Structure formats: structure tokens, C-alpha cells
Regions:
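Hydrophobic, often amphipathic alpha-helical segments used for membrane interaction and targeting
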Residues: 1-86, 104
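C-terminal structured interaction module
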Residues: 89-120
Length: 120
């Protein structure tokens, strides 16, 4: 992820994102609180909605950055995880925004026939 963040984008883009975050820190903190609250409630739909609402915001990832950071990685994991899970009991930990949506890791695994249950 750090390679994608720091080597996959120009210093100008990194500076733009940092300045945007600093200039909008209150809104960014509030957004993170909402996302954390939805995560703690295991409310994937709200998590996805919060993520989608940020689209077009200058502080948000560009579509190509979002693909690189989230969706392409989900696809790779969904391809690799079955062999890993077949070999041994497996606990998979990923960032919260890898979970929801049609291209989310949970949906990709369900489409392969896996049963997904939240941890309680």
C-alpha cells in the first residue's frame, strides 16, 4: 500500500492530497468518525455510502488511485485466498473499505461460493 501511495503518484499529487486534508481537517475527521462508527456497527452499506459520497471531492482518490489501492488488490486477494484458506485455517485482515460494494472482497469471495459471517 505504501508503494502505491508514495511511488505510484507524483510528489505534486501527494502534496495536493496532504494540503487538501490539512485545509479540510474538520470535515476529514468527521468523515473518519462516521466511517469508524459504521465499521463498529458492521454496517457495510453505510461504509460504502460514505466512501461513494467522497467521490469528486479533491481530497479523495482519483478513480485510477482507487482502483490501485482498493479494487485491484481485492481482485488479487480473491484469486489467492482460496488456496491459502484451503491449506489451513485462515484469518484475513484488510482495511475497512476493502469489504463493501460490488467489487468488495466479501462480494468477490461470496461469488466463489464462500459463506461470509461477521465476527461477533
Amino acid at each position: 500500500q505504501f508503494n502505491l501511495l508514495f511511488n505510484g503518484s507524483s510528489l505534486q499529487r501527494q502534496a495536493q492530497l496532504l494540503m487538501c486534508t490539512l485545509n479540510n481537517i474538520e470535515a476529514e475527521v468527521e468523515n473518519l468518525k462516521k466511517l469508524t462508527n459504521a465499521y463498529m456497527k458492521q454496517d457495510l452499506n453505510t461504509m460504502f455510502k460514505i466512501s461513494e459520497e467522497r467521490k469528486g471531492n479533491q481530497c479523495d482518490a482519483l478513480p485510477s488511485e482507487e482502483d490501485a489501492l482498493i479494487y485491484n488488490r481485492n481482485k488479487i486477494w480473491a484469486e489467492k485466498l482460496p488456496a491459502i484458506m484451503k491449506a489451513a485455517p485462515t484469518f484475513v485482515a484488510v482495511g475497512a473499505l476493502h469489504l463493501p460494494g460490488e467489487k468488495g472482497l466479501l462480494k468477490l469471495l461470496k461469488s466463489q461460493g464462500y459463506t461470509i459471517e461477521p465476527v461477533k
